[in-house]
């Protein structure tokens, strides 16, 4: 935000120079980005009056003038400006004057005519880029007065970065409040005398969306002269704030916007049919905006309409049809409080960012509307004439923001600041900030001012007290603390160790947003309710993630769109699952997830191109699980997941509890997300794995191991993992290894069945096993498989 230093000093004028003022504003939390003079360096320019203006005898585009600058004679000056005319008060650079760029004014002859000075434009004085003509001063500008003094050009433009929580400082009044508080000075506000109604003209106003528009004020002003010139003082204040003068009506609403921080709008009353209706847009409704573009409105967009059509996007941009033009005589002034949530994101959807939407998205003082309406009415009538009707106020108190009541404890204040501030100082600071304060024993009850949306909790008051007291006034004190060594159990498995393993396997770690697109998330987790944000960055980031897959799959698409088809990425982070049993109704689980797609290996002349499959990812996952020492306790079970391919996925169970999923992304989901080719994902609940099984030292057998192979025929739906698990359980004392080395379907095996070839490794730590013992153990395994799975030995 830009503003004039002199305009600020009209409200509060501390006895400090510009640099100190800028530093003070920065230390108050409103970072000053720049301080620049409002005009170039020049001297010798005064107010003059063109007494005579005649055509130059030797040049069609030049005029010969006689100018009164308050001296004992008139000056002959040749001027080429198209707006030069008799009776005009102008800025005159006299002989000896020096203009910006070290341009010195001397007596000269132009096409044979003497010229004893120069009539200046704004650009020639370094005030603005306007070089369309010479400066036109008011008719009462005192002749001979230094133009720097008359236009108050010994001024600076201060530009500040206003953080989103300090919307109250998007007007001169807000910055002035802070400066007044910091310097313990009174705030000198302009006198705003209510304008009484002199006519009875009104328009009916209906608010159909009170949640989006808790307060709407409208006032008819009739008989205005829209062509009346905007006063130079107002033009200059607008210019120094970076706003170009348009016409008197628009300039007045912009002036109130900059002064009080309250957006306003003026409608051409004669173009409104019936009355004003504040409602949500109809799906597909269109509106031609003031810039001539057509906006297609969504049902969640607030509009100001008449009885037949939309007139404006509420709090964002006016419509062309109802806008003020050169023929306008009667206007309806609008001043409203729109809920920030009803405005947020709507302007960006249409490629807009207006001064009004910028303020409404952050929050406007809900108690400001009557004051702004009276200020705008007075300025409009003073400049354009006309008569005002009564103010129509439609307010829904139930939906207006409520002022927060906050308890500030002395113990909390001292602990967070680390310094004791006297009670009377704390009370004084809070009251100067605009709070209604009630003192108690070692605490304060403060009711936040209506313009401070960011004062909600105790820490906010602590911050305000410290800010106003001055961070530099808080003494440096060494921290007194004792160091306690953190305990580290042998069973603790660092997530960093797992990340290193995945890095070694070619994965890259990514970090994605916890805020995701609710529509995409519903594709991945259909029917699962997510936590929605009340004030999202955008609609596409309005839900908290239910898993890490949403962000990871979006990252894959992003990379594939940039010709990176072989992707291996992983992420660790929290998911947010609604749970009525959890604190605040949300369960936060630390998850580890990964995605792979593309070729199994990097391109190589000696390797065939093979696409990754389920077993590639399962193998990587087993390596991770092996680090935990719990691989032998993990089961991969066939279980449906709407995001995964039903025939190429599995749920992961640890001791009967599901801890994750692994599998190929469902083909339908691949299509919807525009994934290129087969994509595989996994996700694990990390906290259920972080407590690893500590390796136990055991004796290594000095006796030979024996291998026996068996082939068993089982039904197609029997998982091979269950077969291996049963063999391990039966041969627990002698079977030290079980491995599946072949799966066969075809000739010799009935349809609906499969043959599993299994190797059994048998060994004892105390002796060499006899053949009879080996045969007995193998037979025991076969019998167990036959009994549980109706397996039979294959011939």
Curated annotation (Swiss-Prot):
Subcellular location: Cytoplasm
Catalyses which reaction(s): tRNA(Phe) + L-phenylalanine + ATP = L-phenylalanyl-tRNA(Phe) + AMP + diphosphate + H(+)
Domain (tRNA-binding): residue spans on this chain: 39-148
Cellular component, GO, one term: phenylalanine-tRNA ligase complex
An example Gene Ontology biological process: phenylalanyl-tRNA aminoacylation
Domain B5: 401-476
Cofactor(s) this protein requires: Mg(2+)
Name of the top EC class for this enzyme: ligase
Cofactor note: Binds 2 magnesium ions per tetramer.
InterPro entries: aa-tRNA-synth_II/BPL/LPL, B3/B4_tRNA-bd, DNA-bd_dom_put_sf, Fdx_antiC-bd, Fdx_antiC-bd_sf, NA-bd_OB-fold, Phe-tRNA-ligase_IIc_bsu, Phe-tRNA-ligase_IIc_bsu_bact
Domain of life the protein comes from: Bacteria
Main location class: cytoplasm
GO molecular function, one term: ATP binding
Positions of Mg(2+) binding: 454, 460, 463-464
Keyword vocabulary terms for this entry: Aminoacyl-tRNA synthetase, ATP-binding, Cytoplasm, Ligase, Magnesium, Metal-binding, Nucleotide-binding, Protein biosynthesis, RNA-binding, tRNA-binding
Location of the FDX-ACB domain: 701-794
Record EC number: 6.1.1.20
Assembly and interaction partners: Tetramer of two alpha and two beta subunits.
PANTHER family: PHENYLALANINE--TRNA LIGASE BETA SUBUNIT (PTHR10947:SF0), PHENYLALANYL-TRNA SYNTHETASE BETA CHAIN AND LEUCINE-RICH REPEAT-CONTAINING PROTEIN 47 (PTHR10947)
Family from the record: Belongs to the phenylalanyl-tRNA synthetase beta subunit family. Type 1 subfamily.
Stated name of the protein: Phenylalanine--tRNA ligase beta subunit
Lineage: Bacteria, Pseudomonadati, Pseudomonadota, Gammaproteobacteria, Enterobacterales
